Amino acid sequence: MAVSSSSFLSTASLTNSKSNISFASSVSPSLRSVVFRSTTPATSHRRSMTVRSKIREIFMPALSSTMTEGKIVSWIKTEGEKLAKGESVVVVESDKADMDVETFYDGYLAAIVVGEGETAPVGAAIGLLAETEAEIEEAKSKAASKSSSSVAEAVVPSPPPVTSSPAPAIAQPAPVTAVSDGPRKTVATPYAKKLAKQHKVDIESVAGTGPFGRITASDVETAAGIAPSKSSIAPPPPPPPPVTAKATTTNLPPLLPDSSIVPFTAMQSAVSKNMIESLSVPTFRVGYPVNTDALDALYEKVKPKGVTMTALLAKAAGMALAQHPVVNASCKDGKSFSYNSSINIAVAVAINGGLITPVLQDADKLDLYLLSQKWKELVGKARSKQLQPHEYNSGTFTLSNLGMFGVDRFDAILPPGQGAIMAVGASKPTVVADKDGFFSVKNTMLVNVTADHRIVYGADLAAFLQTFAKIIENPDSLTL
């Protein structure tokens, strides 16, 4: 897949004839010399433009809706090499795929601004394209100035800390002398008054130690020279627990000796971001055992014709979703949800360096043979990093199958923006009792579904799984 450029544009566009993706470039503002001439002053307002020097910037294109930066995998052309319109110039790695970037212009690759293995944000200049050989040196100077300015920005020293002059000493206020406000009212507890009367103690002469000078029973007993009772002595309040500052960072264990740190690839960064985002969605999980004897028999019949087990499972899931559309719904803003008009089954595929989910669009409507053919094409594109954006970001329901690795059960993490994801385990011989109490051995696989509890409830998911199990256990409808 290739990407090419068009003057004075900044957004990506598709070129259907070559199945390429185009990105924009513009004439460098600092090198423009524009003269507008009116062609027909009386009747027309059209203007023509002449440009003295055309040095165009090659921008980092947005290859997907979630892409914020791209990585230069390799430059196909070298500096100074002549380019023809439509030729691929550079390979860019997005968060999902590798794509060729091509140009709409004849000229020369004057300068490479972003080297191989480096990343750049979407819209940033990654190279310069000159119209003639005479402009190559000028473009290289421009590229050098760009590089030096970016380095200068990176090493700008932080301003020295501002030292404040010592604050002037604040005069301490003079001690305040207590002023008598005349005879005060004696405040004592009822029991203290009773004790004072019993022991003939002048209550007015007792100094209170209670709240706000209140005279307590122990104060009276002290004044009377009597040992206070144990019950009258209030135990000292326990010391408050020490206030500790809340940790703002997680204390990670130190790196083991001889360990190495490997930075995320663009794809791994995208997966990490999606997994963290999924933590904000309230989910629940439901498991369901499914008898696969009939499905296994059907698979043996259609396998020689190119039908895959993935296609069988995707077809069964699509047919079940058609009967339970709420499981195929999406909640993206936390305030509403939408019933998707298509059933697009995304299937997880492990590829070198990450994970991607090619999408089988309209899985409920395609027949098994076309679905299998489409799936093989998608897997080939995924492993060569040639998937187009709509082939991996349009899923409404996800299927993850680890049964091929012998895994009998597992839970899958719900992708953001989808209502549910199905985790399919391996089919294994299991002893099962029928309704009459007779035991037999049947092949059974465990299916676990993780769903968004904001839109899908337990009864919805249970009904969906029952329908899915009936289709698998009676798979004749899959071949229709």
UniProtKB/Swiss-Prot annotation:
Cofactor: (R)-lipoate
A GO biological process held by the record: pyruvate decarboxylation to acetyl-CoA
Cellular component GO terms held in the UniProt record: chloroplast; chloroplast envelope; chloroplast stroma; chloroplast thylakoid; cytosol; cytosolic ribosome; pyruvate dehydrogenase complex
Matches recorded under InterPro entries: 2-oxoA_DH_lipoyl-BS (IPR003016), 2-oxoacid_DH_actylTfrase (IPR001078), Biotin_lipoyl (IPR000089), CAT-like_dom_sf (IPR023213), E2/Pdx1 (IPR045257), E3-bd_dom_sf (IPR036625), PSBD (IPR004167), Single_hybrid_motif (IPR011053)
Annotated organelle transit peptide span: 1-53
Catalyzed reactions: N(6)-[(R)-dihydrolipoyl]-L-lysyl-[protein] + acetyl-CoA = N(6)-[(R)-S(8)-acetyldihydrolipoyl]-L-lysyl-[protein] + CoA
Region named Disordered: 140-168, 224-245
Composition bias, Pro residues: 234-243
Signal sequence segment: none
Residues modified to N6-lipoyllysine: 96
Catalytic residue list: 453
Keywords: Acyltransferase, Chloroplast, Glycolysis, Lipoyl, Plastid, Transferase, Transit peptide
Record-annotated Peripheral subunit-binding (PSBD) domain positions: 187-224
Subcellular location: Plastid, Chloroplast stroma
Principal place of residence: plastid
Co-factor note (free text): Binds 1 lipoyl cofactor covalently.
Lipoyl-binding domain ranges (all copies): 55-133
GO molecular function, one term: dihydrolipoyllysine-residue acetyltransferase activity
UniProt EC number: 2.3.1.12
Coiled coil segments of this chain: none
Highest taxon of source: Eukaryota
Stated family: Belongs to the 2-oxoacid dehydrogenase family.
Name under which the protein is recorded: Dihydrolipoyllysine-residue acetyltransferase component 4 of pyruvate dehydrogenase complex, chloroplastic
Taxonomic lineage: Eukaryota, Viridiplantae, Streptophyta, Embryophyta, Tracheophyta
